[in-house]
């Protein structure tokens, strides 16, 4: 999803440089860039053998235009390689194949060795920190600047030490560990900081365990979650088929540079430290809508009941005095008409009978409708994947089956996963539980979970049910996994299979049976849970280095669908198609002059959205399904795209017309200007008209009214989604005032020329008495803009009264100031190239 808009930007920059009188071919990566196509495939088909083939065919059918752009980029750019779709997830491919740990090159006849470093256009780039490689996620616009030779600037971070001791107990997995660490570090506060793991416990973790911990750095807020090189690193490099001379180089250079950890290595000095005894980790999930909200497996049923009232959609309610009894809605009738026989309200109140595959199934609050083994976070770890396979084997042998209403999926981050599950003999058991491979990509984790069966969808939507997903992913933000699924829980692949067997989350898995065997005996989770010895022995016998060398020897080849794509004639300029709804030339460089206009104050601004705490980039720029009745869906229909061909917002990121219409359009976003009503709508002021965010923005822009957004803490948490900033500027938003910003989104706002402003300590929209209906003047931008300065804000209410306050300008360096005054980072680079400075 981030690769296509990056290439679109680079292609547009070539046009822009030509228009400014420069040589367009100078827009070319000077730093090696690998683009792995992993975000496009969706779970349209599942639960049968041909699901993978059909999903891939559908992927190419939907994304032919986008992939043709990437084929052009392969030919047009040097230092640029593409890993075709169907290969795996970028971070797992990096871990298993691309990462060198220690690079070498010849310079002036001398061999040079230096540590591997990288930036990636996905926040989970940090996964490679588990291999001893320093790297993190950045916005696509920052990555483009780095590719073009611009240095990456950052403030020197504090380093928090996370000490690990002990050994994981039986029953606990690396997933349980990372959810525990995420909870701890979020509470400690590590946003903008480096986290480094140390302590004797590191020797008791495999490298895939470490990669799992490093992967979820964005979820606990850190820039990186670093593990030093040690013996496990070398073992992993050998185990993934890396050449012997490379492994020797990594060991020798790391030791020479003092980068190699042993149990005798002294504890480093840190800004602050935390400690976790691995022996205390226990089976856990996280949810229903934040990765840091860990739930002990033993408390899962009670926690769901406690969370349920807050998850019920507007217009529906739980019956008074009970947790989940009668199905009610304010102002609506629950009578089932003669033409609605596919969905029938059951006697039990929050329960509906829906027809599915010829049988009646009960859908209620807490029903699991999606169970997905997904994401590089966990599918990169053979222990939890084999654990899931062993549990599936024991379940099948006891006669258990997945509940029929559960949409199952297994989407490994690497083809090697399928190889070792096949070699171990476990894949057939997973398939008997309908966990067939549906693709090699991000899929459910990114929101490409595909549609639910029509009758189940209708039962949920019409009755306001709070259904659940259980996935082995890294994020569960509101409406990310599926728009109709309000309770989403992160867990290990082993627990994903377990919850698919039960079909509900309101169950005590320690004491209630998963089901009953053929003799009617109850089968408890403990009865089929794999032992550590079973997992260890299976991994040792099934996983071979040759699997990695075989798969990655053809990593750039692609399947017959990729090879069938037309290879464009080599051209330095991309041939934009005026009628394309996937790839359009963006407006960011249109009419740009060589000279930079001075920064100006923001006057008579209106609030487009007044938002609360922990607004994610998913809230700001959704990745999933495009609602047909909202502006983006209307645009596509006006351009003769049928609803069935909408694809997702993520796949449309090469078209700014779609993306700006979807900005702040998440179905779960709550604009407090509308008293927290869900959806991408706002109040146009001063008329009071309720409009979509996009339509209100267009009306404001016609009147030349600048816009701002006001928000709470952790604004922009989540994915490194540059479209959350691109869409913001295209909607005419000049500034965002928040209590705090997540690192990547703050950088993205600056990189797009949007001013990030932070309330001073102790101040919030509530304490200041802001309603969002005021007219705002932000002064001091024109005459005192410098790193870390303050500017003045005057908010004039409808009755003429004023609220005055200062805000901190989150331009953290001189480079930030330069980017902002140029209108963005890419505009800065383009001007420098046109002047011959770069």
Where are these regions (language model features)?
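Fe-S-dependent hydro-lyases/dehydratases of central metabolism
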Residues: 1-838
């Amino acid at each position: 999803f981030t690769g296509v808009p990056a290439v679109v930007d680079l292609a547009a920059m070539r046009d822009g440089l030509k228009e400014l009188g420069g040589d367009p071919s100078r827009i070319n990566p000077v730093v090696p860039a690998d683009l792995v196509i992993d975000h496009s495939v969706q779970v349209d088909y599942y639960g049968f053998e041909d699901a993978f083939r059909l999903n891939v065919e559908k992927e190419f059918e939907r994304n032919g235009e986008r992939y043709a752009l990437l084929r052009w980029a392969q030919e047009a750019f040097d230092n640029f390689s593409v890993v075709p779709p169907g290969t795996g997830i970028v971070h797992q491919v990096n871990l298993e194949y691309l990462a060198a740990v220690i690079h070498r090159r010849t310079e002036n006849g001398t061999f040079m060795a230096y540590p591997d470093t990288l930036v990636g256009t996905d926040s989970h780039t940090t996964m490679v920190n588990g291999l001893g490689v320093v790297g993190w996620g950045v916005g696509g616009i920052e990555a483009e600047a780095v590719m073009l030779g611009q240095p990456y600037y950052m403030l020197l971070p504090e380093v928090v030490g996370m000490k690990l001791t002990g050994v994981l107990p039986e029953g606990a997995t690396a997933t349980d560990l990372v959810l525990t660490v995420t909870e701890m570090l979020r509470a400690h506060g590590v946003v903008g900081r480096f986290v480094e793991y140390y302590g004797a416990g590191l020797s008791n973790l495999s490298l895939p365990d470490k990669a799992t911990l490093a992967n979820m750095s964005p979820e606990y807020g850190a820039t990186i979650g670093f593990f030093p090189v040690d013996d496990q690193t070398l073992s992993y490099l050998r185990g993934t088929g890396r050449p012997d001379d490379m492994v020797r180089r990594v060991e020798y250079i790391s030791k020479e540079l003092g980068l190699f950890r042993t149990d005798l290595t002294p504890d480093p000095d840190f800004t602050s430290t935390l400690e976790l005894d691995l022996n205390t980790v226990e089976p856990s999930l996280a949810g229903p809508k934040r990765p840091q909200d860990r739930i002990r497996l033993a408390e899962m049923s009670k926690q769901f009941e406690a969370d349920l009232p807050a998850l019920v959609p507007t217009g529906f309610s739980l019956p008074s005095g009970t947790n989940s009894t009668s199905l009610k809605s304010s102002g609506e009738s629950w009578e089932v008409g003669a033409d609605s026989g596919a969905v029938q309200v059951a006697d039990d109140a929050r329960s509906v009978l829906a027809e599915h595959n010829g049988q009646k199934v009960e859908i209620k609050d807490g029903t699991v409708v999606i169970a997905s083994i997904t994401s590089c976070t966990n599918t990169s770890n053979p222990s939890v994947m084999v654990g899931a396979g062993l549990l599936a084997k024991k379940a099948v042998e006891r006669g258990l089956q997945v509940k029929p209403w559960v949409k199952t999926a297994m989407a490994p981050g690497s083809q090697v996963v399928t190889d070792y599950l096949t070699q171990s003999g476990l894949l057939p058991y997973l398939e008997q539980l309908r966990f067939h491979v549906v693709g090699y990509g991000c899929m459910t984790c990114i929101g490409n979970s595909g549609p639910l069966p029509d009758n189940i969808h209708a039962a949920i939507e019409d009755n306001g049910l709070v259904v659940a997903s259980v996935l082995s992913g890294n994020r569960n933000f509101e409406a990310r996994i599926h728009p109709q699924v309000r309770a989403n829980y992160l867990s290990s692949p082993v627990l994903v299979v377990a919850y698919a067997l039960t079909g509900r989350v309101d169950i005590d898995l320690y004491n209630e049976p998963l089901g009953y065997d053929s003799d009617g005996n109850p089968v408890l989770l403990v009865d089929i849970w794999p032992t550590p010895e079973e997992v260890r022995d299976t991994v040792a016998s099934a996983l071979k280095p040759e699997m990695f060398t075989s798969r990655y020897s053809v990593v750039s080849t692609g399947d017959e669908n990729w090879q069938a794509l037309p290879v464009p004639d080599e051209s330095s300029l991309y041939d934009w198609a005026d009628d394309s709804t996937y790839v359009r030339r963006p407006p960011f460089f249109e009419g740009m002059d060589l000279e930079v206009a001075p920064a100006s104050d923001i006057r008579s601004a209106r609030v487009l959205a007044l938002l609360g705490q922990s607004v994610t980039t998913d809230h700001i720029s959704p990745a999933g399904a495009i609602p047909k009745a909202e502006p983006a869906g209307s645009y596509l229909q006006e351009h003769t795209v049928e609803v069935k061909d909408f694809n997702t917002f993520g796949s449309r990121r090469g078209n700014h017309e779609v993306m700006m219409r979807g900005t702040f359009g998440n179905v779960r976003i709550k604009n407090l200007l509308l008293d927290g009503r869900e959806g991408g709508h706002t109040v146009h002021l001063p008329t009071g008209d309720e409009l979509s965010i996009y339509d209100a923005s267009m009306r404001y822009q016609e009147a030349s009214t600048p816009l701002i957004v006001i928000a709470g803490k952790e604004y922009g948490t989540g994915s490194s989604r540059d479209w959350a900033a691109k869409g913001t500027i295209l909607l005419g938003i000049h500034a965002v005032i928040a209590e705090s910003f997540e690192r990547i989104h703050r950088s993205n706002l600056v990189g797009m020329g949007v001013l990030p402003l932070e309330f001073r300590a102790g101040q919030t929209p509530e304490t200041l008495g802001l309603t969002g209906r005021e007219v705002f003047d932000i002064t001091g931008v024109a005459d005192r803009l410098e790193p870390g300065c303050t500017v003045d804000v005057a908010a004039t209410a409808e009755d003429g009264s004023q609220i005055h306050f200062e805000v901190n300008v989150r331009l953290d360096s001189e480079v930030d100031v330069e980017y902002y005054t140029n209108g963005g980072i890419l505009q800065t680079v383009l001007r420098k190239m046109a002047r011959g400075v770069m």
